[in-house]
Curated annotation (Swiss-Prot):
PROSITE patterns: HTH_TETR_1 (PS01081), HTH_TETR_2 (PS50977). Transmembrane segments: none annotated. It comes from Staphylococcus aureus (strain NCTC 8325 / PS 47). GO terms for cellular component: protein-DNA complex. PANTHER family: ACREF/ENVCD OPERON REPRESSOR-RELATED (PTHR43479), ACREF_ENVCD OPERON REPRESSOR-RELATED (PTHR43479:SF11). This is HTH-type transcriptional regulator SAOUHSC_02897. Keywords: DNA-binding, Transcription, Transcription regulation.
Length: 185
């Protein structure tokens, strides 16, 4: 990528981040971002496929920091139960802190893009390793189901409409996904 194109892309991300923080992700359109920057829509879409794509890049630095700390959990805690409990607390807090951006990413036109992202793969690998069993198909299924239950929309629904506390949500996930063997590792 040319230097000026790289600078334009960075400027777009910075202005989008600023507008999202000030007015909320859901209140800012791609058109508004282009107008704020004084660029055409073509320029904006040359860098980002859609708003979901832009949101993913806006939050990318935070995702990288999150993953670094997330991986450290396995070094700091030893039982599967502790690792899962602490990792869920950390992940759920990240979802609360970044709800609007994550909802935008997950609601994008290309539903598979999120599941093919490096962030999803890191989460998958983390929990797959935690659930590892002789049945690889079952382990993959279990990991995918956990991550689906951790999607921003499912989490928000449970908290906002079912009125489940965050701690209860975490504990329910621990009960569902860690069998007695996993609790005593």
């Amino acid at each position: 990528m040319r230097k000026d194109a790289k600078e334009n892309r960075q400027r777009i991300e910075e202005i989008a981040h600023k507008l999202f923080d000030e007015e909320g992700v859901e209140n800012i359109s791609m058109n508004r971002i282009a107008k704020e920057l004084g660029i055409g829509m073509g320029t904006l879409y040359r860098h980002f496929k859609d708003k979901s794509d832009l949101c993913y890049y806006v939050i990318q630095r935070d995702l990288d920091i999150f993953i670094t700390h997330f991986k450290q959990i396995k070094d700091d805690y030893h039982s599967n139960y502790e690792v899962m409990q602490v990792s869920l607390d950390y992940l759920l807090q990240f979802k609360i802190d970044n709800k609007a951006l994550l909802q935008c990413i997950e609601a994008g036109n290309n539903k598979l893009r999120f599941y093919q992202s490096a962030f999803y793969q890191e989460l998958f690998d983390f929990y797959y390793d935690l659930f590892k069993s002789d049945d690889d198909t079952y382990t993959k299924f279990k990991t995918d189901m956990l991550l689906q239950s951790l999607s921003t929309s499912v989490f928000a629904f449970q908290i906002e409409h079912r009125h489940i506390s965050i701690e209860a949500y975490r504990n329910y996930l621990l009960n569902i996904y860690l069998d007695e063997v996993g609790r005593n590792d």
